[in-house]
């Protein structure tokens, strides 16, 4: 950093030296760390392949015999599961920071993940399913009746989902900062590039899973289709275990969450005590002086509090970050529709056959459309990393992470709007002509409208990820104080999970008979008597309103950050944060 007393002539050589150092760091960002980074990226690739192996066709699995859950019920279960994988992230971050360290926490969570994954091939196999669900219950769940709305075999299904969800949550909270730790001493450019390739690995795992596992599940067998992701988790455990010799690891040094809650509690109590003194006419001068200070300053030792200056400043930084995470909730609500309501919509469009070799024709897996999102990311991230970002950086035009998040919000809003327009057209066509198609041994009454009309909404979500998701990860890691990186990464994923739960709650709300947008309660998977288009338009409207709010938040945050940097560098600024 530049000294506050240096003149322009002193700052220019220093600035040139910093640029040269940055260029050197970019050239050798991963030198000597490739084995460690490779092990982290391969672990994440295998874990994501397993995750998408569960989520890509879970709606179809629960929608079909012998489970026969309604389409809305299956979508709600998947949204709840994905919400759990994110909501549990703060606990995973706390476990690593306070007890185990990141490396051991990841290993433990992968073992728990594997245990939960074993439930799904057992549920899919008839011989073991009866032991888990009860044979009498299975015989009745395929026939509509007064108990049609009940979820067949729900205890075993949700038990497996909870175990997997807790494992995913802990991996998610820790593997991202753990991977960044391998290169963080190489500077912010190395960290930015690591996040690009980390997200690239996530989507490569998704493509492998959606391309192979989803096809096997839909056209061959759910037993085999769920056994493969179980093996992937086992391999991820082995890869990460073997990488222990090359990883940069740190022992647990206390939880930032514990300090955070203590400081928040103390500051609230301190404010209350000050208010009581003012109401009694005591210490008015002291109160007037403290009111000009931050709410948290009373916690500092320099102000008579029990906490160090550094810990209090870390919590103050956290408070400034949380509004950004809150504004991302509607983004995640729309994003998670990709594997739930978008799949329901796919199953009610004309799905082409891709093979007539077998006695039963193989159809294009509905989950394959998610690959358009993943393939787009796979192609554009290297282009962005190697060409676009360097050009923008040279010209000083590289947007901040918050501006990129705002662009991502716009594209995800367009995706929900496109889905609503398509669903409106589908509902009109299905009244004129209905075709019956068998997908995964379930008969769906679909509109005579090609599945390929869904491609735009998936591509729009893919574009949104390149901006919002990657920038969100980068923001969560770079804006966090060093002592709170795991905690803030956990909070980032926590609010992502809130978005999934909001989607599940909205879906349940519009499914009640008083509203009647979703579940018709006449057919387990049929959405032809529903108004899914209204749900999509509602999501687009919520995201649009949030985008306007986020623009205000992001401008204020960027102005404050620039003001702080200018003060730190001794450069006068006329802008007010």
UniProtKB/Swiss-Prot annotation:
Q: Which PANTHER family match?
A: OLIGOPEPTIDE TRANSPORTER-RELATED
Q: In which tissues is it expressed?
A: Highly expressed in skeletal muscle. Moderately expressed in kidney, liver, and heart. Weakly expressed in colon and brain. Expressed in low levels throughout the gastrointestinal tract and in Caco-2 cells. Expressed in retinal fragment epithelium (RPE) and neural retina. Expressed in small intestine, stomach, duodenum, jejunum, ileum and colon.
**Which UniProt keyword terms apply here?**
Endosome, Immunity, Innate immunity, Lysosome, Membrane, Peptide transport, Phosphoprotein, Protein transport, Symport, Transmembrane, Transmembrane helix, Transport
| Chain segments annotated as transmembrane | 49-69, 76-96, 105-125, 158-178, 194-214, 222-242, 318-338, 363-383, 405-425, 459-479, 490-510, 535-555
Which proteins does it associate with, and in what oligomeric form?
Answer: Interacts with TASL; leading to TASL recruitment to endolysosome.
Task: State the name under which the record lists this protein.
Answer: Solute carrier family 15 member 4
User: What does the sequence similarity comment in the record state about its family?
Assistant: Belongs to the major facilitator superfamily. Proton-dependent oligopeptide transporter (POT/PTR) (TC 2.A.17) family.
Q: Name one GO molecular function term.
A: dipeptide transmembrane transporter activity
